[in-house]
């Protein structure tokens, strides 16, 4: 799945209008981490992606971004 950034509180992290690939991150049973969806930002950092009907969201300390399905 691909999503397009529709809002970013910091353009150096996610660029407005840019298309990003949604990646599946598989959990590690030893660490009890479940599978999740993730996006990779402009600096190659991984963010947990919370999907919604229209796209999805990312949030962190002093940062948020919204995405729409592309």
Locations of regions flagged by a protein language model:
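Short intrinsically disordered terminal tails
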Residues: 1, 65-70
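Basic/aromatic-rich interaction segments and small domains that mediate binding to polyanionic partners
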Residues: 2-57
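Extracellular interaction modules
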Residues: 58-62
């Amino acid at each position: 799945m691909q999503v397009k950034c529709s809002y970013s509180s910091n353009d150096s992290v996610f660029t407005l209008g840019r298309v990003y690939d949604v990646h599946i991150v598989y959990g590690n049973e030893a660490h009890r981490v479940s599978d999740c969806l993730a996006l990779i930002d402009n600096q190659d950092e991984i963010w947990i992606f919370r999907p919604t009907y229209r796209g999805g969201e990312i949030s962190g300390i002093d940062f948020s971004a919204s995405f729409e399905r592309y």
